[in-house]
Amino acid sequence: VYAAPKFSTELKSWWYPIVGNMAYRGFFNETDARSFASKMQGEDMDVHIGGTPAYSTLGWFDDPVLNTFINYREEDLADLIFHELAHHHLFVKGDTTFNESFATAFAQIGVTEWAKAKENPQALEDYLARRQTKHMVNQLYVQKKIELKAIYESLETEKEKREAKKQFIAEFRQQLNDMSLSDPRLSKLAILAERPINNCLLYTSDAADELTSG
């Protein structure tokens, strides 16, 4: 569960042992997550509930094999494994953006070298194409978060911010739909355009790519 003030792109964080402050609250049960999200909404926060296919205990425990990723393509499964292993090797307390960006870059390098060793150039090409498309989308969210932050900072009253936010979301929705029609690789953006868009979603969509170059 992610939460942010109505007129801020900075996420609320929670402190955990070992890992420090994290910009999300984790749950193993969806009902509990939705209950907590409702509580945050009651405090006038934007909220976003997102799932994750895997998680890392940073080497403290044996990490489980879950049914959320066993049917992944081979290269995407390798990407996930490299990503989670990266957290074992380097994890900066309280810096979600750095940790996720580092793990993303580490995974891409790992999969590239692994696929080369398997001598499967087509699989590598397909993987890198999927990765590049995902990076393009995430960088779009990075830019939109910057734009929305500037809007909030340029206005003084809540009424002005509320109206500007509403217009920003409507225009962003249209942009997602337009992009989905203009590029076959981005067809799934039409699905994103139908989902709730708020301060939290802009952050959660870009955190793993904000410091990477693609």
Language-model features, listed with the residues they occupy:
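Generic structural signal of hydrophobic/aromatic residues within well-ordered alpha-helices
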Residues: 36, 111-115, 148, 172, ...
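Single conserved hydrophobic/aromatic residue that forms the stacking wall/gate
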Residues: 203-214
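An amphipathic alpha-helical core segment
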Residues: 166-205
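Short, charged low-complexity intrinsically disordered segments located at boundaries
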Residues: 3-8, 68-70, 133-144, 175-181, ...
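Long, amphipathic alpha-helical stalk/connector segments used for oligomerization, subunit docking
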Residues: 124-169, 173
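Alpha-helix capping/termination and helix-coil
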Residues: 85, 110, 114, 118, ...
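Acidic/His-rich structured neighborhood in mature extracellular/periplasmic domains
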Residues: 1-134
